[in-house]
Amino acid sequence: MMRFTIAGLLAVLAAGQPASTSQALPGLDATVTKVERAPTASLRDCPPGTNTVTAVSRPGEQFAVVTIAFKASAAFKPSPMLRPSVLDTAGKKFNTASTIVDPAGVPEFSCTFPFRVPDGTKLTTLQIATTSIDLSSFEAK
C-alpha cells in the first residue's frame, strides 16, 4: 500500500529520499490499495454519491481503475479539489471523470478512479493536485 501524509513526507525528505515537493491535501491521509484493469468503470464521485453513470471502453482501450482509501483528520478543511490524474511510462497524462468532493464529515472512505488508457499502458504515478504517488509496484504484478 502506498500512503502519503505530512509526517511521512517530512520523514522521507529528512532521509534524503525523493518525494513529492509539497503536501497538497493537508489533513487527508490517502492510501492507494489497488490498481485494476476493466472494460467498464463506474464514474461515481468520491466519496461515492448518487452518480450511477458507467463508462464502457472502446476497442484498443481499457480502464485502469485506481482504488484509494482516504482518512480525514481534524485538520482536514474541505475545499474544491482537482481531479486525480495518472502518468504512464512515457510521461503521458490521463485524466478521470470522477472528482473528490467534500466528504461531509465522513472520517474514512474509499473511492475508485477510472482512467481510460490504451491497452497495455503501464502507469507510473498518481497525481492529486501537486502530490504524486508511485504506482510502479502495482503495475509490476
What name fits each language-model region?
Residues 1-2, 117:
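Compositionally biased, low-complexity segments enriched in small residues
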Residues 13-141:
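Conserved functional micro-motifs across diverse proteins
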Residues 2-14:
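Sec-dependent N-terminal signal peptides
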